[in-house]
């Protein structure tokens, strides 16, 4: 893993995060079952991928369980700022561009640095909506650039 590049006071023009909400669904109720998506390897997950996963899983759960039948939580935040050295292409690019000279790069995105087995998204729900929550997390896991697994955090005895 790389060391986090997060000192915002030294960095100009940091792109904003696309993640709109971190908690969705019924925030006040206590649900007996809790499931999470955990990554199988250390990786970097962009704010775009986190937002795509949030939209996919939240939309599925809203259609299946209704607004009050679940609580979805994003558990990571994209603090790490990613830089890119823009390379020009096309005719005359060699005259315009510096190549690897002054190659520090400009901030282009933010990512969440995730460790192995770290949980990224959690859905709390009841027994009736367990299969829907599992499918919603599977759809969210497809948006990530790393193999994931679905873990039952709480209420394993209720679903067997």
Curated annotation (Swiss-Prot):
Q: Does the keyword Ribonucleoprotein apply?
A: yes
The family database entries (InterPro entries) matched by this protein are listed as:
Ribosomal_uL16, Ribosomal_uL16_arc, Ribosomal_uL16_CS_euk_arc, Ribosomal_uL16_dom, Ribosomal_uL16_euk_arch, Ribosomal_uL16_sf
Q: Which UniProt keywords apply?
A: Ribonucleoprotein, Ribosomal protein
An example of a Gene Ontology BP annotation on this entry?
translation
Molecular functions per Gene Ontology: structural constituent of ribosome
Matching entries from CDD domains are given as: Ribosomal_L16_L10e (cd01433)
Q: Does the keyword Ribosomal protein apply?
A: yes
List cellular component terms (GO): ribonucleoprotein complex; ribosome
UniProt family annotation: Belongs to the universal ribosomal protein uL16 family.
Q: What is this protein called?
A: Large ribosomal subunit protein uL16
* Gene that encodes it: rpl10e
